[in-house]
Amino acid sequence: METKRLIIVAVGGQGNLLASSVLGEAALLCEIPLNMSEIHGMAQRGGVVESSLIFGDTRSTIISDGEANVLVGFEPAETLRALNKCNANTVVITNLAPLMPFTVNIGQGVYPDLKELQELIHKKTAKLIAFNAATLAKEAGNVLSVNMVLLGALIQTGILPLTVDQVKKAMKTKTKKAFLDSNLKAFDLGFAAAESA
C-alpha cells in the first residue's frame, strides 16, 4: 500500500492522544501497518501535543518537513506552527476555535488573525478544510469531542486507508461508554462539515 503520513497537533487536554489511539486501533483491526510517535511537550500546562502517524510499510516514525500528506490541527495557531510539515499536495484540516495562550491573555503576545492564518495555509497546501469544531462538539452534546469532530473530517477526505466503519468500531473500543453516543455524533458532524467544505 502507498505510505500516508499524518501529523496531528493540539494543545494539551484537547484529546489528540485519544484521536491517535482510535486511528491506531482502526489500523490494527484491519491489519494496516502503522508507526506512531508522540511529542507531549508541556501538555499538562497547555503546551503542544503532536502525534505522527505513518500508515504503510516504513521503519521510521519521523515525518520530516514537507512530508505530511495530511495535517490535522485541533487549535488554529498550532496548525499554522506545524505548516512546515506540509507541501503543495498536503490537505490541512483545522479547527477555527482558538485557545488563547497565557501570553496573549496577559497582553504580552498577539494571536494570529484567523483570516490571514487561513490564507497562509491555503497558499502553501493543496486543500484547507477549516471550520469551528468546538461548535459542532457542543451540538453533539459533548464540548470535549472536538477530537472526534476532526477525526470525522479526516476520514471524509479519504486520504487514510481507513473506512468510517473501521474507525467507528475502534471508537467503541477506545472511548468511554458514557461518551460513545456523543462521540459518534461528533464524528458524523465532522464528516459532514468536511464534505461541504
Model-found features: residue ranges?
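Active-site cofactor/cluster-binding pocket
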Residues: M1-A197
